[in-house]
């Protein structure tokens, strides 16, 4: 009992303890800030390309390509543009809806269309519709409500590399399929390299590469402005908690002109982690030393995976946690569906959650596989019958374990608050 009391005291002290943060959420990848330092030019270019939707709606289908490396502000800029453009359209009495689709998460044409429908609050029948039928439902929905739809296809290069040519053709040349006089569907294609489109047929490529907007990597000075905007204007930290030299240090690590990657996402992630390290050490200031420790822990290759994990709902996270638990207990990499479900039930009950039924757990695993978080293979010799074996597709580490635990805790807190 004494040990339990000591642990409880430890947890309570940590909860009550001081923190350098004020609004840490403004440092997360999903946050859309009020300002976008050093992306004003790109916002203007997007606005010029799409202004005909407002001046002459339905006359043309706009297509824009955005190209730039990871962390150069492509996603946040397009989302901010979509938010502002829709507001301005509304003020002019026009209905413009902006949808943002991540092709790495919605990995097939059908899944992408279902997600577009979800963002439109359009119910898709459960019966097995084809992609073409689903798109027709979406278009009819737009037609009835006189809506202009901007579809951003983020990580479009992934879709190009993994999808059948006919799916790509259908998507980008939709008006060859639809007998529609009024053009209601417009595209923003986001990719890392324009060269990823080199393999496309010329007839498709000509439809995609209409207007190209480049997003160059950030310089040290630009990263400094971005970090300071989150610290000062967005109030990520308590006033005076982050030393100016710390911000300079992080900016110099990642600035393209200083030999870094120019990746703002990693710069923000490093700043957030430095703040957490300061909290752990009981420091009221975020110092260069904290930034150095944070930098040593940041793994650029995990950045995309971490984004995917942060998008999971509670019970999807519990399935991932179950696989990690089995790995720790048994030392194996692959586990049967039955074992994973059994461990998931234990994890859920331990947290006071009602485990989902078998069909729902199977659906979670199917979605996790589509997202690239787990892999599945058929059992070989030595097992009775054909059994599906499941494994995490990412390396299991202490950092990953901490992330999963933190995300589970956050989902439980959100449920409690609602």
Curated annotation (Swiss-Prot):
Disulfide bridges in this chain: none
Keyword Nucleotide-binding among UniProt keywords: yes
Alphabetized UniProt keyword annotations: ATP-binding, DNA replication, Nucleotide-binding
Positions bound to ATP: 72-76, 218, 230
Single Gene Ontology BP annotation: DNA replication
InterPro entries xrefs: AAA_22, Cdc6_C, Cdc6_lid, ORC1/CDC6, Orc1/Cdc6_arc, P-loop_NTPase, WH-like_DNA-bd_sf, WH_DNA-bd_sf
Keyword NADP in annotation: no
GO molecular function: ATP binding; ATP hydrolysis activity
Function description: Involved in regulation of DNA replication.
Classification via NCBIfam families: orc1/cdc6 family replication initiation protein (TIGR02928), PRK00411.1-1 (NF001623)
Stated family: Belongs to the CDC6/cdc18 family.
Xref: HAMAP family: ORC1_type_DNA_replic_protein
Protein name, UniProt field: ORC1-type DNA replication protein 2
Species this protein is from: Sulfurisphaera tokodaii (strain DSM 16993 / JCM 10545 / NBRC 100140 / 7)
Name of the encoding gene: cdc6-2
């Amino acid at each position: 009992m004494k040990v339990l009391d000591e642990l409880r005291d430890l947890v309570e002290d940590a909860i009550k303890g001081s923190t350098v943060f004020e609004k840490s959420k403004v440092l997360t990848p999903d946050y859309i800030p009020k300002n976008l330092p050093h992306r004003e030019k790109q916002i203007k270019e997007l606005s010029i390309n799409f202004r005909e939707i407002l001046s002459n709606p339905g006359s043309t289908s706009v297509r824009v390509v955005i190209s730039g490396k990871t962390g150069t502000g492509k996603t946040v800029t397009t989302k901010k543009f979509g938010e502002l453009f829709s507001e301005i359209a509304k003020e002019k009495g026009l209905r413009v809806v902006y949808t943002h689709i991540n092709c790495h998460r919605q990995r097939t044409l059908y899944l992408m269309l279902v997600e577009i429908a979800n963002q439109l609050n359009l119910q898709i029948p459960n019966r097995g519709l084809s992609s073409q039928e689903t798109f027709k439902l979406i278009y009819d929905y737009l037609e009835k409500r006189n809506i202009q739809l901007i579809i951003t296809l983020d990580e479009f290069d992934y879709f190009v590399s993994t999808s059948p040519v006919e799916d790509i053709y259908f998507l980008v040349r939709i008006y060859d399929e639809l007998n529609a006089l009024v053009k209601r569907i417009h595209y923003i294609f986001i990719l890392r390299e324009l060269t990823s489109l080199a393999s496309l047929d010329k007839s498709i490529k000509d439809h995609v590469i209409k207007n190209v907007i480049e997003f160059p990597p950030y310089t040290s000075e630009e990263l400094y402005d971005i970090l300071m905007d989150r610290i000062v204007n967005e109030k990520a930290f308590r006033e005076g908690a982050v030393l100016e030299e710390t911000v300079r240090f992080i900016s110099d690590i990642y600035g393209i002109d200083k030999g870094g990657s120019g990746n703002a996402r990693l710069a923000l992630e490093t700043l957030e982690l430095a703040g957490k390290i300061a909290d752990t050490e009981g420091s009221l200031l975020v110092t260069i030393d904290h930034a150095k420790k944070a930098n040593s822990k940041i793994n650029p290759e995990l950045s995309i995976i971490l984004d995917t994990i942060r998008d999971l709902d509670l019970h999807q996270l519990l399935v991932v946690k179950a696989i990690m638990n089995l790995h720790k207990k048994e030392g194996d990499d692959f586990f049967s569906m039955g074992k994973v479900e059994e461990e998931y039930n234990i994890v859920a009950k331990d947290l006071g959650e009602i485990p989902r039924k078998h069909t729902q757990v199977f659906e979670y695993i199917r979605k996790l596989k589509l997202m690239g978080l787990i892999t599945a293979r058929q059992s070989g010799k030595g097992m009775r019958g054909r059994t599906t074996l499941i494994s995490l597709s990412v390396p299991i580490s202490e950092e990953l374990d901490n992330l999963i635990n933190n995300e589970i805790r956050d989902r439980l807190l959100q449920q409690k608050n609602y």
